[in-house]
UniProtKB/Swiss-Prot annotation:
This protein's pathway: Protein modification; protein ubiquitination
Function: Catalyzes the covalent attachment of ubiquitin to other proteins.
Residue ranges, compositional bias (Low complexity): 1-37
Entry's Gene Ontology cellular component terms: nucleus
Molecular function terms from GO: ATP binding; ubiquitin conjugating enzyme activity; ubiquitin-protein transferase activity
Gene: Ubc2
Organism annotation: Drosophila melanogaster (Fruit fly)
Domain UBC core: 86-232
Annotated protein name in UniProt: Ubiquitin-conjugating enzyme E2-24 kDa
């Protein structure tokens, strides 16, 4: 006799639970049909709530709108890193070589901690009009080194038909005849050779080249004077 009310209560509880939790019971209520008829429309306010606004202006919207930019950086950064890595390794190798075995009358090394900016010292070649002088040069390596030549300029004033007042050097291996097989040591050797024997046929300062060809004595006198005045 006592089991009948228990069964009735259980039925009422089951009915109430089915009505209140209809979305969790598949294909049994109208509310569930409404939910299951749009399985892929998660963007509706009922399905997403606060996330719908985040997609437009929140973190997820920011990621969606700017996602391409980090991917582009991820693609380009390794190329730059590889280029810097190649040039840095090459420059470090040349630094070790020139430190252990510098060219005659030459020295070179980085300015402080910057591997791409060097300063060089060249002593005036013995027997030349620049003998006794100490000439300072700036050397700049680009990230494309050794596939592009270094930029080498005189900081010390010098009277030379192939070197202008800004210190720019007219030397073929620093321009069109550059090769990745060349090194900064070979460049400094070539500059020393240019101090010993200038090239008036390809001058950077035409007036000095003309004087060298037509009045060598006066040319040499002025070159020695400049060496004494600016390089000692």
């Amino acid at each position: 006799m006592s089991s009948t009310p228990a069964a009735g209560s259980a039925a009422e509880v089951a009915t109430s639970s089915a009505t209140s939790n209809a979305p969790s019971a598949p294909s049994t209520t109208a509310s569930n049909v409404s939910n299951t008829s749009q399985p892929t429309t998660a963007g509706t306010p009922q399905a997403r709530g606060g996330r719908g606004s985040n997609a437009n202006g929140g973190a997820s919207g920011s990621n969606a709108g700017g996602g391409d930019e980090p991917r582009k950086e991820a693609k380009t950064t390794p190329r730059i890193s590889r280029a810097l890595g190649t040039s840095a390794k090459r420059i470090q190798k040349e630094l070790a070589e020139i430190t252990l075995d510098p060219p005659p009358n030459c020295s070179a090394g980085p300015k402080g901690d910057n591997l791409y900016e060097w300063v060089s010292t060249i002593l005036g070649p013995p027997g030349s009009v620049y003998e006794g002088g100490v000439f300072f040069l700036d050397i700049h390596f680009s990230p494309e080194y050794p596939f592009k030549p270094p930029k080498v300029t005189f900081r010390t004033r010098i009277y030379h038909c192939n070197i202008n007042s800004q210190g720019v050097i007219c030397l073929d291996i620093l321009k069109d005849n550059w090769s990745p097989a060349l090194t900064i040591s070979k460049v400094l050797l070539s500059i020393c050779s240019l101090l010993t024997d200038c090239n008036p046929a390809d001058p950077l300062v035409g007036s000095i080249a003309t004087q060298y060809l037509q009045n060598r004595e006066e040319h040499d006198r002025i070159a020695r004077l400049w060496t004494k005045r600016y390089a000692t």
